[in-house]
Amino acid sequence: MTTNGILQILAFTAIIWALAKPIGGFMAKVFAGERTWLHRILRPVEVAIYKLCGVDEAAEQRWTGYAGSLLAFSLVSLLFTYLIQRVQQWLPLNPQGLANVAADLGWNTAASFTTNTNWQAYTPETTMSYITQMIALATHNFFSAAAGIAVAIAFVRGFSRHSANTLGNFWVDFTRATLYILLPMSLLAALFFCSQGVIQNLDPYTKVTTLEGAVQTIPQGPVASQEAIKMLGTNGGGFFNANSAHPYENPTPLANLAQMVLIFLIPAGLTYTFGKMIKDTRQGWALLAAMTVLFLAGVCVVYPAEQAGNPVITRLGVAGGNMEGKEVRFGIANSALFTVVTTDASCGAVNNVHDSLTPLGGLVPLVNIELGEVVFGGVGSGLYGMLLFAILAVFIAGLMVGRTPEYLGKKIEQKEVKMVMLSVLVLALCILGFSAAGIGQQTVANSMTNHGPHGLTEVLYGYTSAAGNNGSAFAGLSANTMYLNTTLGIAMLCGRFLMLIPLLAAAGSLAQKKLVPVSAGTFPTHGPLFVTLLVGVVVIVGALTFFPALSLGPIVEHFLMHQGRLWS
């Protein structure tokens, strides 16, 4: 590792901590319905939306109604996205005359963007028209992110309310998340990206003659507007196949820094929002501290692993670390940092090829997703995911001292623990179940570019990314097949909604409880001891579940690499 690289990582971390309070405080005001500096402009628009859609702003929903609204909206979103892809050939803004998307790929993509996964089993430049990119994919980057934020706010209300039967109104939370948070921030980010050289046009693709005399086609499109929400909403789907390694998406080191900040901005801010809503900001800082510890631990593995490089190559006299699959303009430090950031959050955008990482370098992003995307995590999903582990942590602490566990003045009882464990187990069952079924299929074996432990890792990473709603990939797996499109799409939906429903049920139960007065025996949940316990529970429950599978993949590949044994 270099001093310059370490300083860049520390500077990035400091920026995130500095922005958490102002962004989090703003979001707390938005969801409390308080006046903000955007109120004068956007409040009339908000009211008009409610009138147009027949939404009663004052009406609140029980957890069942909240979950029902979320599922209904997501179903409509999925069908709309699928339909647009299937008829794009006859729609305007298709200067390249791209054909309709195949049925299985359309299903996979619709499930992907509805669930905030943005898994892409296609090459965007040659598959999706401008109209599809804008009204089917980019809009769902907003919608899926807003839905995640809404669920997180509803879950927090489970702690902030007592003796209550409702968690808020999904349609109101969804509208406010989109209108006051995602749209203004995305507009500012898009303008900044344009200033850095990210393109924004509706031009046909440009044909140029290279210095060698060959003709090359250079894709165009409305990239900056999609790039902004792709990062801010932790969506991750690239306008181009190279994603954020493409100079039209991520042209400068400053743009690269801004993209990483956008990925963590809302997840970090929501921890402060949580603290404000429960009237104890120390609780939010404790969650942010736990997230930061896990984040820096990941960086401290990936960066030195990539800087050390492949020992087989080093023995040949080639020094300089592992630069395979990395952009020279970013280097190893920023590539390693981006890798950890995008997999800590459920973003999935990449500025380097994850399949070309060293075994230990590839292990960390895989584990990050398998932890449940709780290390900052996606917009909304990171907060409610970490709160699930916080409930487990206080439950375990209560068992150790023989007390009924409490968290934020609420007793954690049988129902809450069952719902929390159901949410936690869904991810493991989806990842391991689909991976085990897929690895035995000949069609999956044919899709693997590599064999041996690396091939297993490609399949495991694919289903992990899908079920964890991340969207990044070990690109050696050729995923555009009927079997993979279908099963990965199912894994995305299961990983999203089978986790959310038990979570909302737990929130509804918590909201009904009375507050328990703080006593001398109450376990404090805002200090270093709780942060340590929380980190330990995340690692033990999240990571150890997958240790046998990881042992057969990146871990054994690491030892084989040091023995000089490689796989192709």
Swiss-Prot record:
It comes from the Bacteria. The keyword Transport applies. Keywords: Cell inner membrane, Cell membrane, Ion transport, Membrane, Potassium, Potassium transport, Transmembrane, Transmembrane helix, Transport. One of its GO terms (molecular function) is potassium ion binding. The system is composed of three essential subunits: KdpA, KdpB and KdpC. Part of the high-affinity ATP-driven potassium transport (or Kdp) system, which catalyzes the hydrolysis of ATP coupled with the electrogenic transport of potassium into the cytoplasm. This subunit binds the periplasmic potassium ions and delivers the ions to the membrane domain of KdpB through an intramembrane tunnel. This is Potassium-transporting ATPase potassium-binding subunit. It comes from Solibacter usitatus (strain Ellin6076). The lineage of its organism: Bacteria, Pseudomonadati, Acidobacteriota, Terriglobia, Bryobacterales. The gene is kdpA.
